[in-house]
Every structure is written in structure tokens, then in C-alpha cells.
UniProtKB/Swiss-Prot annotation:
It comes from Mannheimia succiniciproducens (strain KCTC 0769BP / MBEL55E). Conversion of glycerol 3-phosphate to dihydroxyacetone. Uses fumarate or nitrate as electron acceptor. Keywords: Flavoprotein, FMN, Oxidoreductase. GO terms for molecular function: glycerol-3-phosphate dehydrogenase (quinone) activity. The keyword Thylakoid does not apply. One of its GO terms (biological process) is glycerol catabolic process. Its EC number is 1.1.5.3. Belongs to the anaerobic G-3-P dehydrogenase subunit B family. It catalyses: a quinone + sn-glycerol 3-phosphate = dihydroxyacetone phosphate + a quinol. It is an enzyme of class 1 (oxidoreductase). It comes from the Bacteria. Composed of a catalytic GlpA/B dimer and of membrane bound GlpC. This is Anaerobic glycerol-3-phosphate dehydrogenase subunit B.
Length: 431
């Protein structure tokens, strides 16, 4: 099986790169080993929320110089400010064309409400999620937080107690209530099945839609806004938008414990677009080994194609970090298993020195979280000290940064994905 590009990994980085290439007529295949981290995400995308010294970031452009000084191995610094800003704008345009229904701008971060009632700085958020500007107040002063009876992944009272502590909500009267929704009674018999995805699947056929509308109206009372767990609408926001229109209430949804519908919706929309453009998905498959010819990757073999090699002009490593086995740790080393790429080494972290992997304080940023492969400004992967000509890395498999600590995981994913896509398109156009 031969393609122009083979992408290993079907998360936000792999799908963004793949559909961008397919739009330009470059034949792509994505090897998809199952659920991606996107399925467990809040649906919001971070560009850069904090600097390594702990300072809060309001504007990416204004904070870039400080990032470059404090974290010279960060992928943003390797790519360069102008490239990153260009790819950010490119993704914002792409998100609109995909109808991802995101709000926000790279000019300035905003704050989103978390399921525990905190406020977290971010770049883009689903327009159904409650957000506030960095200095602003929430636009409604009377809010009801609605839980679902028997659903333990969303606790409205805990949310209310924490939300009141934020200055942006100090002017609000916040109350709580619960929806019963009789359609869900059979799920309540087994708490393991009473999850957001199961709830959405039961409700999506709208068999008792009017009853649900009436129950929400009654539970909200005279309030102008209500927060609900994100359990309404599996494929997109159309079900939730129908609820808003039918109730006449400003409804907002908050991410729940994983799996998260907000992330699942985005994953499905990206994947649907990729396949609609003619992209090939190797679902339930896993890349196991690779073969090189000179300074190029010649072929890879997968779990379902052990005898028949998968070949391509270019290979893109989008396999993620430890969560998705894009990186593996053993007692003596951390390594990238498919190509055995070089791993980033910093002052605080060495992949072959186990004592450098962790901080003594549990709550501190952990050095191992900055593990990943070495890239250059073109996102080419380094192996044995040399850049591999036709192998690129994108997303969480790249090293030199801690996406959790800095709040930049999604931004790194989409900027590197678009950078690699543009590189390959340019190479194909010149041939």
C-alpha cells in the first residue's frame, strides 16, 4: 500500500495535518489506534496560558520573547514567532470552515469556566461553554446550575461553591437544581453506564424532547441562564442549540469527567472532514516497526499488516505522548518506539537518567512531561544526531515543553501540524 503521506496518529494534530493535505490533493492515510486524547479534553484549545516562571499569559505575541528566553527548546521557539502566528491564524480560519463553533482569538486569551467552578485561561472555546474576558464579568446575574439525578460526573453544588469565589461571578445569584429526565431511568440502574456518552445516545432521538424542554424551564424558574453538564448532542451542537431555542433560556454546557462530549464532537467533525476529502483511515491499527533506506524512512509495518508494508513519500509522527504510547518509559530510559528518534535533553531532564524524570514535590511540574522527540524548524525528526529527510513530528510527541504546565498542548499540535502540511505541499508543488 503506497500513499503520498502516512500519518501515525489520529488526534487533533494528525487529523489537522491530514485534512489540510487532502484539501490540496495530497493522498494521505492515517493509522488510528483508537481513542485520542481529544476524546477526553474539555473542548477548549490552549495556545499559551503560562510561562515557565509561572507568569500568566494574556497575549501570546506579547509573551513570546519571554517564552523564548525561558524555554529555548519549546516548539514555538524552534518554529519562530512569525511562523507560529501565521499557523494560528490559519487554524482559526480552518476551524470556521469546519463549523467547530469556537470563540476566542490569538490576540488575547479568555477564561472558561471549568466543571469544578474555576476559571482557566485559554485560546479557543466552544461557543456553548461559559466564558468571560480577562477583565470582564459574566453577562448574567442570575444563574441556575442544573445537574442530572444520579449522574455523579457533574456536581452542581460543588460548582456553585467554587464559582462564587471568582470576582467575575461575584455579582451573580447562583442556585442549583436537578433534572430527572425519565428517559434515563434504565441507565441509573448501573452507574457505570450512566456517563455523558450514554446519556447523549439515549436523548439524541428526541423521543421526549418537549418533556425535556418543559423540565428545564421548570427547573430554571425565573433565572436567565443555566449551566448543564455536556450530555446533550453526540455528533455536534445541533441538539443543544435546539434546546436553547425551545426553552428561550441562555443555556451553557460544561465538560464532565471523561469521556467528554465537547472533545468527541471535535474529533468526529475533523475525522468526518478528512474522510470526506478522500483520506484513508487504518482504524484499530497500530504502527509496530519501521525500515530505513539511507536517511529516509522507506516503509512501516502495522499490527494488521505485518507482511504487507505501508510505504509513502513522507511520514508524519503524530502518535502523542505517554497517554497514547507515542512515548514509552522503561526503567532505564524514555524512548519513541517506532523510529527510535532522538529524545530532547534539557538542563532538568535526561531520558537516560531516571532521577531527572521527576520532581520531589508531587505538585510541581514534572520534568518527564517535557520528554519527546527532537525536531528542527521544519519539524523534521532527528535520529542519531541527523535530521531524517522524509520524517516529521507534530503534536505531543515533540519534546522540549510541558503542555500541562504551560497550557499550550493544543496550540503546539495545530501549529506544527499546519507547518508540516505546508512543507509537504510545497515539496509536492515543486516536483
Amino acid at each position: 500500500m503506497n500513499f503520498d503521506v502516512v500519518i501515525i496518529g489520529a488526534g487533533i494534530a494528525g487529523l489537522t495535518c491530514g485534512l489540510t493535505l487532502q484539501e490540496k490533493g495530497v493522498r494521505c492515510a492515517i493509522i488510528n489506534n483508537g481513542q485520542a486524547a481529544l476524546d477526553f479534553s474539555s473542548g477548549s484549545m490552549d495556545l499559551l496560558s503560562r510561562l515557565p516562571n509561572g507568569s500568566t499569559v494574556d497575549s501570546f505575541a506579547q509573551s513570546y520573547a519571554a517564552l523564548a528566553q525561558q524555554s529555548p527548546n519549546h516548539p514555538y521557539v524552534i518554529l519562530g514567532k512569525d511562523v507560529v502566528l501565521d499557523k494560528i491564524q490559519q487554524f482559526e480560519t480552518l476551524a470556521k470552515s469546519l463549523n467547530l463553533s469556537l470563540v476566542g482569538s490569538s490576540d488575547k486569551n479568555h477564561k472558561r469556566v471549568t466543571a469544578l467552578g474555576g476559571l482557566r485561561g485559554t485560546w479557543l472555546s466552544p461557543n456553548s461553554v461559559p466564558t468571560v474576558s480577562l477583565e470582564g464579568k459574566f453577562p448574567h446575574d442570575n444563574i441556575v446550575l442544573l445537574g442530572i439525578e444520579g449522574y455523579h460526573d457533574f456536581q452542581p453544588q460543588l460548582l456553585a461553591d467554587n464559582l462564587k469565589q471568582n470576582p467575575q461571578f461575584a455579582h451573580c445569584e447562583i442556585t442549583t437544581n436537578f433534572l430527572h429526565i425519565p428517559e434515563l431511568d434504565h441507565l441509573r440502574q448501573n452507574s457505570r453506564e450512566f456517563r455523558s456518552v450514554n446519556i447523549a445516545q439515549v436523548l439524541e432521538y428526541k423521543l421526549s424532547f418537549n418533556n425535556l424542554v418543559d423540565e428545564i424551564k421548570q427547573a430554571v424558574g425565573n433565572a436567565k441562564a443555566a449551566f448543564l453538564p455536556a450530555c446533550f448532542g453526540l455528533d455536534d451542537q445541533s441538539f443543544f442549540e435546539s434546546l436553547k431555542q425551545a426553552t428561550g433560556i441562555e443555556l451553557y454546557e460544561l465538560p464532565t469527567l471523561p469521556p467528554s462530549l465537547l472533545g468527541i464532537r471535535q474529533h468526529r467533525q475533523l475525522r468526518h472532514r478528512f474522510e470526506k476529502l478522500g483520506g484513508v483511515m487504518f482504524n484499530g491499527d497500530r504502527a509496530l516497526r519501521s525500515e530505513f533506506e539511507g536517511n529516509k524512512v522507506a516503509r512501516i509495518f502495522t499490527q494488521l499488516h505485518l507482511e504487507n508494508a505501508v510505504t509513502a513519500k513522507y511520514f508524519v509522527l503524530a502518535s502523542g505522548g505517554f497517554f497514547s504510547n507515542g512515548l514509552v518509559s522503561e526503567f532505564e530510559e524514555i524512548y519513541e518506539p517506532l523510529f527510535r528518534s532522538d529524545i530532547v535533553k534539557t538542563e532538568r531532564f535526561n531520558a537516560t537518567d531516571r532521577f531527572s524524570w521527576i520532581s520531589k514535590r508531587f505538585a510541581d511540574p514534572q520534568p518527564y512531561q517535557s520528554a519527546g522527540v527532537v525536531i528542527n524548524a521544519e519539524c523534521q525528526v532527528q535520529k542519531d544526531g541527523n535530521n531524517v529527510e522524509n520524517l516529521f513530528a507534530i503534536g505531543a510527541v515533540i519534546g522540549g515543553y510541558n503542555g500541562i504546565e504551560l497550557g499550550c498542548g493544543s496550540g503546539v499540535a495545530v501549529t506544527t501540524a499546519l507547518k508540516v502540511a505546508d512543507n509537504i505541499i510545497a515539496k509536492e508543488s515543486s516536483n
